Every structure is written in structure tokens, then in C-alpha cells.
Amino acid sequence: MNIVLKLSSNACQQLSEKYKSYEQTSKNPYIRFFAKVGKTSISVYTSGKVVFQGSDAEKIASEFGHVAQVVPKKQTNLIGTDEVGNGSYFGGLMVTASFVSDNHLKFLKEMGVADSKKLTDEKICQIAPKLIEEIPHVALVVEPEKYNEVIASGYNAVSIKVALHNQAIYLLEKQLGSQPESIVIDAFTTEANYKKYVSAEKNHPLTNVTLLTKAEDQFLAVAVSSIISRYKFLENLKKLSKESSFTLPSGAENLSDKVAAQIIKSQGIDALNHLAKLHFANTQKAMKIAQL
């Protein structure tokens, strides 16, 4: 468990005094107080940011204003979201929000729905079209060119995902015409970060949002979104490969650097804007390989 809070100077002082007997030395120059309480660490930064990490993080953080998230108890009548493509240099970013009701349970069991990372691409391509047809959802596909434009406008890799998850949920609520009992997002950032970035967005869902790690293992709606997003990503990568006449790999490993370098040599550096997320380190590595 990892919880981040922004506390006032007085609150940081109170925390430091309360847990002074647990204080330990930290080599990080930006940490002004560090303590280890059982299996939980408390790091107070000079900026006022406080990080609680460990099994009792939520309990200790609640003493300083953290409100514990209520984890939905039901599998159904909720919206779940997940994204794919954020870790891949080539291809766009896909975010899907899906709504699962009691009526969908039998169908999803028959389909063998699970987290997309546990399914082969072949299996995903088999079941995703059926999920798209049967399950109420909103899938947002951001092509690399649009992604690069948004990043250049001031968004970062986290805030763009917050915006997309938020918009997908908002649009799905409108599509349903009613509020789900709960909304679960497969956590890709801290709750504090999510709230900070989502406050800048124009539209907001009517239902409270819960961020959970490994939510795709706990909620079918998140697993469905994971599969649909993966399918959309694979389709997008296939389309871009055809347009570029190169087989574009998924991920951000050395192979991506080499393929990008080949594209630069044959089509020029500008061609990458249509195919890849330019702010990734792969761009500079590819330019070095291409000797630009």
C-alpha cells in the first residue's frame, strides 16, 4: 500500500513529533523526516509531501486526513476502466470504460474473461469483438499523432491518462442514462495525483471513483476494459505497421529503438510523429543509432 498526502508545515511537525521514537536516517536529501513503524515507512519531504508505504499505510495516513477508499463489494452494476499502450513506444493509447450488470455474468464466464495480460493476443482477438457487441462500453483511441499533440500542449504521461479515464467514464454514464453503483479504475497513479489532475477536467462522473491496484483481477468490468483496450491497441499497431511498411513492435525495448532508427533513415524523423510517442527515451536512442 502506497499513500501520498500533501500536509501543512504544522501537520508535518505534528507527525514528526508523534513518530520521533521510530525515526531512522534517510540518505535522501529531500526527506526531512523518515520513520519506520513496524512494516510501514513514513517519509516527510521538504516540499510537504508525505509518503506512507507498507501494510499499515492507510491506518497511519488516516490520522492525518487520509480518507480510506471504500472497495465495492459487488462484482456487478459497476463501471470498470483500464488502459493499454501507455508502455509501448509505437502505437496509440487506448482507454476503455465498461459496464457489467448481473445479466452479463453468464456470458462473461462463457467467454473466459480475465485480465488481458493473462490472455494471448490470439485469444483476445477472438473474444474482444464479442465483448464489444455485448457489453456497454466506451473505448477512446488516441492515435500517436494526437497523443504527441496533447503532450506538447502541457499534459504529461499521467495527466493524459487521467483525462481519458475520466472522459470514458463520463461518456459511458451518459450512454447508460443512469448512475452505476460504483466505478473502479485499475490504478496507474496515486489517489492524490488522480484528484489533482482530474480537477482540471471539464466533465466529471456523477459516481465516486475508486482506484485499485490489480483491479482487473478483482472486477470483471475492469477485465473487460483491459481486453477491449488491448484489442484496440493491437488493431492500431497493425494499421500503423501497414501504413509505414514496417512491422512495429509492442513495448519499449531495444527492438523499438532499432525499428525507429530504420524508419528515420528511410522516411525521415518526422515520420515517427505518426507512429510513436515521441517523448519516450526511444526517440533519442533511435536518433543516435541513425546517427542524426
From Swiss-Prot:
Manganese or magnesium. Binds 1 divalent metal ion per monomer in the absence of substrate. May bind a second metal ion after substrate binding. A divalent metal cation binds at residues 82-83, 186. Keywords: Cytoplasm, Endonuclease, Hydrolase, Magnesium, Metal-binding, Nuclease. It catalyses: Endonucleolytic cleavage to 5'-phosphomonoester. It holds the Pfam family DUF3378. Its cofactor is Mn(2+); Mg(2+). It is found in: Cytoplasm. InterPro entries: RNase_HII/HIII, RNase_HII/HIII_dom, RNase_HIII, RNase_HIII_N, RNaseH-like_sf, RNaseH_sf, TBP_dom_sf. Residues 76-292 form the RNase H type-2 domain. Its main location: cytoplasm. Endonuclease that specifically degrades the RNA of RNA-DNA hybrids. PANTHER family: RIBONUCLEASE, RIBONUCLEASE H2 SUBUNIT A. This is Ribonuclease HIII.
